[in-house]
Swiss-Prot record:
Listed GO biological process terms: DNA damage response; regulation of DNA-templated transcription
Coiled coil feature spans: none
Name recorded for this polypeptide: Uncharacterized HTH-type transcriptional regulator YciT
Domain HTH deoR-type residues, every copy: 1-56
Species: Escherichia coli (strain K12)
Keyword vocabulary terms for this entry: DNA-binding, Transcription, Transcription regulation
Signal in keyword set: no
Family annotation (SMART domains): DeoRC, HTH_DEOR
DNA-binding annotation, residue ranges on this chain: 18-37
Length: 249
């Protein structure tokens, strides 16, 4: 994917639907070129075409979400990877930032064992030198993730020193929250383990709130996010006695 196609995809993700005319104006190329780019992106399952428009895919699609704010998430992933030591066994939960963390660890050829509930992450690491343990459960097709009672049982049987977890929202009154009940249940099972729990998320999630609680906040050790986080949110997080890593973007 070239830089123009990344720009197109970002616009479509941000707006949900963008006309071919607007994409041509924004990128400075002809509508013919835009249609060629859209054909390419549709074949890669990043978006879908409608008459005269490009339309975003379902927000549960991991690959599409990973391309949203890609550069920012890549910076977060590289910082998170620096916390992982050679020979360590870690848990990486589902989600776009976590998928980039897994990819980064694979590219760095670190001798680590990665336990995950994400079949997407497992496939991403198929050629990487690290060992991958994919836990079983009920398969959520859109998120490409395992959930349910069997997944909870699997989590009880494995051990890891760090867990990297994604969130969908955070507010001072609610703490960390998720929008999927089954996924949230899996995360809470992870938090019952004796491990260092690390939130890996871009700053857009702060200020949002969803139906299902992840936590309590006191169970987490660190938060890795970007420098666009609001000062008030940062202050509240620090008052929760979390170690906050703010990556400059």
């Amino acid at each position: 994917m070239n830089s123009r196609q990344q720009t197109i995809l970002q616009m479509v993700i941000d707006q949900g639907q963008v006309s071919v005319t607007d994409l041509a104006k924004a990128t400075g190329v002809s509508e013919v070129t835009i249609r060629q780019d859209l054909n390419t992106l549709e074949k890669l399952s990043y978006l879908r075409r409608a008459h005269g428009f490009a339309v975003s895919l379902d927000s549960d699609d991991v690959e599409t979400r990973m391309m949203s704010n890609y550069t920012l998430k890549r910076e977060l992933a590289e910082f998170a990877a620096s916390l992982v030591q050679p020979g360590e066994t870690i848990f990486i939960e589902n989600g776009s930032s976590n998928a980039l963390l897994a990819r980064t660890l694979g590219e760095q050829k670190k001798n680590v064992t990665i336990i995950t509930v994400s079949s997407y992450i497992a496939h991403l690491l198929k050629d990487a030198p690290c060992e991958v343990i994919l836990l079983g459960g009920v398969y959520q097709k859109k998120s490409e993730s395992m959930v349910g009672p069997l997944t909870r049982q699997c989590i009880q049987q494995v051990h890891f020193s760090k867990a990297f977890i994604g969130i969908d929202g955070w507010q001072p009154e609610t703490g960390f929250t998720g929008r999927d009940m089954m996924r949230t249940d899996v995360v809470n099972a992870v938090l019952e383990k004796e491990c260092e729990a690390i939130v890996l998320t871009d700053s857009s999630k702060f200020g949002a709130v969803h139906s299902y609680s992840i936590g309590p906040v006191e169970r987490f050790n660190r938060v890795i996010t970007d420098s666009k986080i609001r000062a008030s949110d940062l202050m509240h997080l620090e008052h929760s006695k979390l170690t906050i890593h703010v990556v400059d973007i």
